[in-house]
Every structure is written in structure tokens, then in C-alpha cells.
Amino acid sequence: MWSQLPTSTATGGLPALGDGADITLSAERKLGDRIARELYRDPDYLEDPVLDEYLQNIWQPLVKGAQARGELSPELQERFAWKILIGRDRSVNAFALPGGYLGIHLGLISVVTTRDELASVMAHELSHVTQRHISRSMGDQARMTPWLIGAMILGMLAASKSAQGAQAMIVGGQAMAAQSQLNFSRDMEREADRIGYGVMSEAGFDTLGFVTMFGKLQQAAGLNDSGSFPYLRSHPLSSERMADM
């Protein structure tokens, strides 16, 4: 898992989030860059050129597919990073971060059997970014104090950890409440499914991968008692989402 980051590093030098408005592209990118810098320094960050090339060969067609479908504006494509960060963690997890960063754990890569299954998860996370779900979720909290904004950043990082790691990083009821605000709404999850499905098809991947990956996650949801599938905590499966597929 990603190593625990000191609380003090999360609150210093944060971009201004405005007053009650969604975060601007510039502010979201700066926030994402700061989080990425912390993750790059983490000992569990994995720099593997071969694996990165494999992931890029999936990621880049998805980004182009989103652009072709009109989901990704030229401004957003230019100003966001569109980079992948790989974690050594064996838990099954992937997560979108502000500013166009995508985090993927080795555990997720190890359970997929096809590129199409992995593409389905990456397309879903990409759609959270293109639809500005992070900005919309955090914009609702723009009046919070800098300390709580820092807690939100730690909450994002904790999403890449086990439940125990998240508990260690986020302390106090207010901070836990801040973390909960980062969970995408049910409508956002379904929107990311729908748009991600289309993007995946546009990029030339077999959309059956979406269905088979959902099946794996559904099976894991019924069997998971060890916390090794944190993706299911941040992306709970519902009968509606399954029916949409």
C-alpha cells in the first residue's frame, strides 16, 4: 500500500478553492500535482517502464476515445496531466485523483484476465475526470477550513490504502466526514459507467470486458472479508449499475 504521509505535508501550500464554486481547472491541476509529488516520493510507488508501457497502451487510446466522443474538451486535455501512478499494493484498487492523475494498484492488474477488463476500470476512472466529478464533489466543500481541505487530500490518499490505513491517516469525526464527501454519488458512478462504456467502445476495446469485470467485482463483494478489495468501498456495486451493463 502507499506509505502513510505526514499530516503536515497535506495542508501547506494548497491552492485556493474559491467560495462555494467548483474548483477551477488550474486549482484542480495544482492540487493533483501536489498529491502526485507525495506519491512519487512514497516507497511503494513503482517505476516500471515495461508495466507503464503496457498501461499506457490502454490509457492513451481511452483518452483519445474520450476526445473523439466529445467527453474531453481541448482545454481539459491540455491542462490536465493524464498520468498513471502505479502502486505496489496487492489490493484490488484504482482511483482518479485531481488534475487527471490515475492511480492503479498491482492487485488490480493481477486479477484481470484481459486488457478489456482493465480498460473498463480505467475508462470508468477516466470518466470521473472528464465529467469533473472530483471538482463537483469538492466544490460543495469549498467553504471548509484549510485543515479540513488537507483532510480531504489525505482522504484521497487513503482511498489507495486498506481500511486500516485509512483509519490511521484520517483522525477525528470532522476529517472522516470530509473523506466521505469525496465518495462519488450514485449518479456519478452510473454516469462514469455509462460514459466509460462508450469511451471504451470508441477506443476499440471489447465492452464485454466491462461486464466480466463487474462480475468479478460482484463476486469479490460477496466473498471479501479481508479488506483486500478497497475498490468496492469507493465504488459500491448496485443492482442498478449491474443492470445498466
Task: Give the location of each predicted region.
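Peri-catalytic and regulatory segments of divalent metal-dependent proteins
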Residues: 2-159, 178-184, 191-235, 239, ...
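Active-site-adjacent, His/Asp/Glu-enriched structural segments that form or flank metal-binding
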Residues: 171-173, 187-191
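Short hydrophobic alpha-helical membrane-entry/anchor segments
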Residues: 159-165
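Flexible hinge/switch segments at interdomain interfaces of large molecular machines
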Residues: 94, 98, 165-171
